[in-house]
């Protein structure tokens, strides 16, 4: 379990996540994240909560359980959705019919962060990931426009299991195959969730 690691390598591997959290906490009004899947440990949940405690408007868009192309990411989101919502973040579930794979962050109206980092333990601890930070209102505006196009095919998840659906999005149906796959992963493979 990467949470138990205390080696110097662990400190370096967590730098991208740490720097992202610190950057997001400095936002004046808004943080918007897009990630294909979200698989966090306690350290990462604490980071998200600290951002939500510092900034009024924090949202995240990720694939819905049925729309996610990564069965492990789908199963982990299914199991941990309430914990994610418990950080205070607004979660939007993408229902576009194909798995969304964007990885970007908007901070206020000038900072854009684009790269290869998923909000998951694999990106934080195992893989070599990069995120480019750009201070430009023009790029921020263009990225926001692109992100909003995807968000118009998403529903906002509520803690009680219901959804706000301002764009009248029809959710992707969870296939029986995906449901069986998720049950297997949930029961037998989530112990290795930091590898997914």
Label each region the model flagged.
Residues 13-20:
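A short, well-structured juxtamembrane/interface segment
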Residues 1-12:
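Single conserved hydrophobic/aromatic residue that forms the stacking wall/gate
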């Amino acid at each position: 379990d990467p949470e138990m690691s205390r080696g110097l390598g662990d400190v370096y591997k967590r730098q991208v996540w740490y720097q992202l959290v610190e950057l997001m906490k400095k936002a004046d009004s808004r943080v918007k994240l897009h990630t294909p899947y979200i698989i966090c440990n306690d350290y990462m949940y604490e980071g998200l909560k600290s951002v939500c405690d510092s900034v009024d408007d924090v949202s995240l868009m990720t694939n819905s359980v049925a729309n996610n192309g990564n069965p492990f990411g789908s199963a982990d989101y299914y199991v941990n959705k309430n914990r994610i919502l418990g950080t205070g973040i607004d979660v939007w579930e993408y229902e576009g019919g194909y798995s969304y794979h964007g990885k970007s962050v908007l901070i206020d109206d000038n900072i854009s962060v684009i790269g290869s980092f998923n909000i998951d333990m694999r990106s934080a601890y195992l893989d070599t990931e990069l995120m480019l930070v750009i201070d430009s209102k023009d790029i921020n505006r263009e990225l926001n426009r692109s992100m909003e196009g995807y968000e118009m095919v998403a529903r906002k998840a509520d803690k009680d299991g219901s959804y706000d659906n301002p764009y009248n999005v029809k959710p992707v149906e969870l296939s029986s195959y995906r449901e069986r796959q998720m049950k297997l992963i949930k029961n037998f493979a989530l112990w290795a969730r930091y590898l997914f």
